[in-house]
Amino acid sequence: MASIGYVGAAGRDLVVREMGGPGSTPSSFVALTTNSGLSNYQALQFQYRRQLTRGLQSQVSYTWSHSIDNDSSDAFLVWGAPGFSDRGSSDFDVRHSLTASASYEFPRVAAAVPLGRSLRGWGMDAVLHARTGFPISVLNSEQYLGITLVNAFRPDLVFGQPLWLADSSVAGGRRLNPAAFQSTVAPHQGTLGRNAIACFGMAQVDFAARREFRLTERGRLQFRLEAFNLFNHANFADAVKYLNSPVFGESTSMLNLMLGSGSPGSGLAPILQTGGPRSLQVTLRFQF
């Protein structure tokens, strides 16, 4: 069974924080809460589902979407930029997303058949996750009215310079080109748009082998061996976006750490989350 769907959503008069800077006065900064936030989401969704046939069922889902806004979080809008100039891809925008899953139940075979009893109750599950990367805004620090505004300005985009450079010595095999960006004079924002650069995508396959043992009429014991990122595909975090950083344009960690797994207080196991290295887990579950 196949289906195609469209999803659209719009947000108006959303609450955002803007930052004014009167300079060297008793209050160097003034935070303004306004309702100038705007958002828009458009998506085309495709899905194919194969019903259970001879122990096999599968599903494939693909989404082509674009999320646009002028502020994706409760952080301040960038300095010196009216709301309309901050309009761009959302921080969490994912243009292409694919998920494919399959589940197989081994057929029941008579115990007299060789290996028949050994295969009874076994099943396998596999899931493929793949998506394009999140967008980032390149930012720089500037002096204005005697105050250092840290990572508050977008630079100018230098015409004719490639955004990315191939470099086998860095994670992902490429890094942003510093020569493609030129610092501006505060308080003016540069010509580079907000979230104009898409970073590294993600792809991984998770796999599980399981067997169920029937203990009572309603009680069952399930054994599972699970492999996360089965093929150990490297997924990298976004490139460092601060122009004055010594590692500007390079990814410095794996994706699972960027998403919060393994960070202090997150409560998440870093190796068992999306974007981490290959890891195995054995579980035993009683169902009733």
What spans do the regions from the language model cover?
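Short, solvent-exposed micro-motifs at the edges of structured domains
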Residues: 1-288
